[in-house]
């Protein structure tokens, strides 16, 4: 009798290196570092957004964010609103955009009133003992200033959108 050599292969799944890991190995923090969010180009882009620029006052941050949102929120109301095929489409769309800016301003102020009920007096220090200044936006006064800037910027963005719809010759 001849004996055949048989070889059996078993695949074993070893420890795979994880690309996405929770911060400090604690999955309950709820903030995951991904290759996208931890990439230098993405972190530079995010740090240049108006909400994260710490060198700018909260009022100016709110104006900048409000201008962009007010300008872009009026367009869908003009082109997709119920009065889109009438002569009053621009006026109705811009008034609807202004109404949405007012509603979002109320939402921002409600968020600020609930999120920043108490201001922590405890300062943050680095390992060398140097004091780290807090972002002024992360306080009730800073958030109120941001909300005021948002309102002014948002309504200005809607007004700018209306002016452009009336002035640009190729709009209609």
Label every model-predicted segment.
Residues 1-22:
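N-terminal chloroplast transit peptides
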Residues 14-20, 39-52:
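Hydrophobic, membrane-facing alpha-helical anchors
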Residues 21-41:
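Short, charged cytosolic
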Residues 33-40, 59-60, 68, 101, ...:
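Mature, well-folded catalytic/scaffold domains that follow N-terminal targeting or propeptide regions
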Residues 43-57, 131-140:
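Cytosolic juxtamembrane amphipathic/interface segments immediately preceding
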Residues 53-71:
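Transmembrane alpha-helical segments and their cytosolic interface motifs
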Residues 81-172:
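Membrane-interacting alpha-helical segments
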């Amino acid at each position: 009798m001849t004996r055949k050599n048989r070889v059996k292969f078993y695949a074993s799944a070893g420890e795979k290196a994880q690309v996405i890991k929770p911060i400090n190995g604690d999955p309950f923090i709820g903030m995951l570092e991904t290759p996208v969010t931890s990439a230098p180009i993405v972190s530079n882009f995010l740090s240049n957004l108006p909400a994260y620029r710490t060198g700018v006052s909260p009022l100016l941050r709110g104006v900048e964010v409000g201008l962009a949102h007010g300008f872009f929120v009026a367009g869908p109301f003009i082109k997709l609103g119920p009065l889109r095929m009438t002569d009053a489409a621009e006026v109705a769309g811009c008034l609807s955009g202004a109404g949405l800016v007012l509603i979002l301003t109320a939402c921002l102020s409600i968020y600020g009133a609930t999120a920043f009920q108490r201001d922590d007096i405890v300062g943050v220090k680095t390992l060398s003992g140097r004091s780290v200044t807090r972002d002024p936006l992360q306080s009730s006064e800073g958030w109120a200033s941001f909300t005021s800037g948002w309102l002014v910027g948002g309504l200005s963005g809607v007004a700018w959108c209306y002016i452009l719809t009336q002035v640009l010759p190729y709009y209609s």
